[in-house]
């Protein structure tokens, strides 16, 4: 795979070896480096992957015709109801049911939701394709 990415060749190598089940110690021996260095390479690769995902989510959110602000004190049920209502107004079919929406929102905004109640504000967008984008940078 020779496509351009935000990963260095070394990061790609380490991730490929980890995916094959290799321990950091075994990778370090193979690459003639320390386990600590392998750990640092893997950690930086995961940070780059997360930044790439966040960038893609940001770009998708720019194209989201539906955006709702989830405010402190809102319940997950209220958020889902508003999200579905606003999507319906725009003629957009959300590709998930309410249970899956609750799971996805809680997963993406886990540190902002406690016991199904929003503790700090964030936004959710819905793309024309019905995909949900949770924007924690709002």
Curated annotation (Swiss-Prot):
Disulfide bonds: none annotated. Pfam families: Sigma70_r4 (PF04545), TFX_C (PF14601). GO terms for biological process: DNA-templated transcription initiation. The lineage of its organism: Archaea, Methanobacteriati, Methanobacteriota, Methanomada group, Methanobacteria. This is DNA-binding protein Tfx. Belongs to the Tfx family. The keyword Secreted does not apply. Gene3D superfamilies: DNA-binding protein Tfx superfamily, archaea. One of its GO terms (molecular function) is DNA binding. The keyword DNA-binding applies. Keywords: Activator, DNA-binding, Transcription, Transcription regulation. Transcriptional activator of the fmdECB operon. It comes from the Archaea.
